A protein has these predicted regions:
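A detector for short metal-coordination/catalytic motifs
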Residues: 67, 78-119
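Histidine-centered nuclease catalytic patch
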Residues: 39-74, 80-92
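Short, charged surface segments at domain edges that flank catalytic/cofactor-binding sites
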Residues: 2-39, 98-107, 111-114
């Protein structure tokens, strides 16, 4: 019983954090992010449904915005949880440098495209 109540409290806390944060990611932006990454941002798989993953977790002050969201496969998203991304990549023995280089390039492209888009 205690486990369920802890899970319920954690879910309520997460719901409050998400509701309190400024989350301005639109469906069109999410589609553009998925197209730019062409698969999981972490492991590169292109199979399955991609989930929205915050590079900086919501619990650490992250938000659902163009510059913080990447597509992640289910296993990577569940494994990363709310860990710091570079430490998690090292532990999983994934290519940290490749991720960071792609993240910076794709993020800049998406932000530039959004700057030119009408509001």
């Amino acid at each position: 019983m205690a486990v369920n109540s802890r899970r319920a409290r954690a879910a309520r806390r997460r719901k409050r954090r998400v509701a309190a944060a400024v989350n301005d990611l639109t469906d069109a932006q999410w589609t553009a992010i998925k197209a730019a990454w062409n698969g999981c941002a972490y492991c590169g798989t292109t199979t399955g449904t991609m989930q929205r993953d915050c590079v900086m977790a919501i619990s650490r002050g992250g938000r659902y915005t163009v510059d913080n969201v990447v597509p992640a496969c289910g296993p990577c998203n569940a494994s990363k949880c709310n860990d710091e991304v570079t430490g998690w990549l090292r532990r999983k023995r994934l290519d940290e440098r490749l991720f960071l280089e792609r993240y910076v390039r794709i993020r800049a492209e998406l932000l530039a495209a959004n700057a030119g888009a009408p509001s």
